Amino acid sequence: MRLNPEEVSWVIQQEIEKYHEDLSLKFESAGRVLYVGDGIARVWGLDDVMMSELVEFPDGTLGIVLNLEIDNVGVIILGSDRNIREQDIVKRTGKIASVPVGEGMLGRVINALGQPIDGKGAIETKEFRAIESSAPGVVQRKPVNEPVQTGIKAIDSMIPIGRGQRELIIGDRQTGKTTVILDTIINQKNTGVCCIYVAIGQKSSTIAQVVKILEEHDAMKYTIIVAATASDPAALQYVAPYSATALGEHFMYNGKHVICFYDDLSKHAQAYREIALLLRRPPGREAYPGDIFYLHSRLLERSAKLSTELGGGSLTAVPVIETQANDVTTYIPTNVISITDGQIYLESDLFYAGVRPAINVGISASRVGGKAQSKAMKKVAASLRLDLAQYRELAAFAQFGSEMDKTTQAQLVRGERMIEVLKQDKFKPISLSKQVMIIFTGTKGFLDDLPLPFIKNFENEFYLFMDENHPHISNSIEQSLDLDQKTMEQLNEAVTKFKSDFKLRYQI
């Protein structure tokens, strides 16, 4: 039988047209799973896939492409790998990982993918934002010039934080790092600032405790908690801080002010090390991959104070690093110290000595926050850091028991009282005006002749006295953020009167 080529082509053409009529063919780029385990998969056949692209497994689980190799791609699985098998088909989505953003997220506890895990139902929001985005450029930024009031006397007076700054909290475990964060969140009530707390690799019970504390202080309504617990895969712990930053960027680009707390980046680095080793990336120092610095720098560089043209919003980053045996010279702590604009160092020796918050002022620093500090605080706390530094030096010398002159004794007395003034109960942030007034009292020498056990009572009763008898002084400081000569004289008179009454009452 002899075939006519024209007839054959006509028949083929008819068959093709029939397909066009019956169904619209969809071409998908797909590959097959070569290996799966420990939260990662190696996939063959995805030749045209992009770096960081989302891919989908047959059970609906998503993964992010993290390694592009000659014959396969390495994928981190965002969820359980229990139902994924070798030879399963993996499809490209053509999308980069993104999370839902918007006002509807406030007050909720979500996972690293933006899905609610607090049992309060679905989140109503239609906006999404890519978890990875480039940091604002130099022209888009503005110098840090507005303060973030933490409500903690030691921080607001000596290590001030500005909106758009990156300030590291560093210290051993159980030294009060999370307490400093919770105090700061509670103090943002009625300021219009949104707070995002990212829990990386923490116990679920710890996160539940954080939620309970914030609810008790009515702080959840302006807070988002992003939880990647210790039981979550390393991939979700790796993604969580980037998702939280995307949430914060949405508010920042809409002209709002956001503080993002990353608790903590040590566990984040460990999760990334685990992923990198499983993907067979070459290990470097302490077995971390070569791009571990870039992991944190690209995250923290997204924090900024935007220019007025872009709305003037800000994203302040407060990362946490956990040290071992007070050693800040190891790899990850030194990396993050060099990326951030300052650090608050919490010391276990101070914590156990009863100095809480256990801030070591000598090692702590704020490289840009001083420009944002209020004028009132600058005036009263100017000599505070020097007083404490001199006290620490003299206290070490005084242990030898040698005789000291009156000036040295006066410096020791002043230092002891200022340390007592800077102690603070947890979850009780103090307003700017009260901080200014009590630090003024200490630095001007009003407390020098009071016995140490009475300092706490003096402080508490002094606040009540000022609220009842001199509310105009507090109002003046809160409104102008300054302490003019007239207000300073009024404050001086008020402190003098209160002190004489206090000494009579306690027969000092």
Swiss-Prot record:
Cross-referenced PROSITE patterns: ATPASE_ALPHA_BETA
Source lineage: Bacteria, Pseudomonadati, Chlamydiota, Chlamydiia, Parachlamydiales
GO cellular component entries: plasma membrane; proton-transporting ATP synthase complex
EC number: 7.1.2.2
Alphabetized HAMAP family for the sequence: ATP_synth_alpha_bact (MF_01346)
Provenance organism: Protochlamydia amoebophila (strain UWE25)
Top-rank EC class of the record's enzyme: translocase
Highest taxon of source: Bacteria
Residue sites binding ATP per the record: 171-178
Main location: membrane
Coiled-coil features, chain-numbered ranges: none
Function: Produces ATP from ADP in the presence of a proton gradient across the membrane. The alpha chain is a regulatory subunit.
UniProt membrane topology term: Peripheral membrane protein
NCBIfam families associated with the record: atpA, PRK13343.1
Subunit and partners: F-type ATPases have 2 components, CF(1) - the catalytic core - and CF(0) - the membrane proton channel. CF(1) has five subunits: alpha(3), beta(3), gamma(1), delta(1), epsilon(1). CF(0) has three main subunits: a(1), b(2) and c(9-12). The alpha and beta chains form an alternating ring which encloses part of the gamma chain. CF(1) is attached to CF(0) by a central stalk formed by the gamma and epsilon chains, while a peripheral stalk is formed by the delta and b chains.
One of the Pfam families matching this protein, by short name: ATP-synt_ab
Protein name: ATP synthase subunit alpha
Compartments in which it is found: Cell membrane
Keywords tagged on the record: ATP synthesis, ATP-binding, Cell membrane, CF(1), Hydrogen ion transport, Ion transport, Membrane, Nucleotide-binding, Translocase, Transport
